[in-house]
């Protein structure tokens, strides 16, 4: 746009009107960047190699961790609401978690623009760092019932993280709380399932499937539980898609080479595709 021929003061007034009276002076006010702490966020990328493509690799993983932070925020709150029997807020939170997984599924397409040649250039600079060591991802798995105490070991060098993950390991999962809620509403769940060690993780239990079957056979009677069950299925469905896209992205970039963290890479990721978080909810579909 051509400079306005009027005075500076008049120009400033015209400019403010042109931008629909948007605030333009933040000398004494909080700006967008101030609120989001963008100076810190955008100054947290430190490539170790001289290669152009490492920035993509860093930002891909940093943004994934930010989405996982939100996911944990929602899952922790949803679990508390289920525990207290307040399913309305929990259902909304679980729907949001599913959409976060969908967001992360689409994000793999960006990393997939990195070719094997490009990745091989930066791989020597990564050391043994690996997504396998993500403590936020580990807590997500624990909240969803996929628990294994051995997976605490990569965090033993960080006392505060280890303590938080140990607490997550021994806290009943979201699914544990859903099962307890069914029992509280009079559905027949075995006492053994209700008092089992929370750190043991989820495994199939016949009485739980029987209870869920009653919910599905009489949804009008157990409408909130019926909705909860479907939200859990939605969540695991999206999680499975994320895992599958993870496998295919890694395979197209590194093939079947070992991962930087020492795992079998694609072989390990493929084995995780067989993980079932809510087994009774899936099995009952064959038995309805």
UniProtKB/Swiss-Prot annotation:
Its cofactor is heme. One of its GO terms (biological process) is L-tryptophan catabolic process to acetyl-CoA. Heme binds at residue 246. One of its GO terms (molecular function) is heme binding. It catalyses: L-tryptophan + O2 = N-formyl-L-kynurenine. Keywords: Dioxygenase, Heme, Iron, Metal-binding, Oxidoreductase, Tryptophan catabolism. Its EC number is 1.13.11.11. Binds 1 heme group per subunit. Gene3D superfamilies: 1.20.58.480. It holds the Pfam family Trp_dioxygenase. Substrate binds at residues 57-61, 119, 123, 260. The keyword Oxidoreductase applies. Pathway: Amino-acid degradation; L-tryptophan degradation via kynurenine pathway; L-kynurenine from L-tryptophan: step 1/2. Homotetramer. Belongs to the tryptophan 2,3-dioxygenase family. Heme-dependent dioxygenase that catalyzes the oxidative cleavage of the L-tryptophan (L-Trp) pyrrole ring and converts L-tryptophan to N-formyl-L-kynurenine. Catalyzes the oxidative cleavage of the indole moiety. NCBIfam families: trp_2_3_diox. PANTHER family: TRYPTOPHAN 2,3-DIOXYGENASE. This is Tryptophan 2,3-dioxygenase. The gene is kynA.
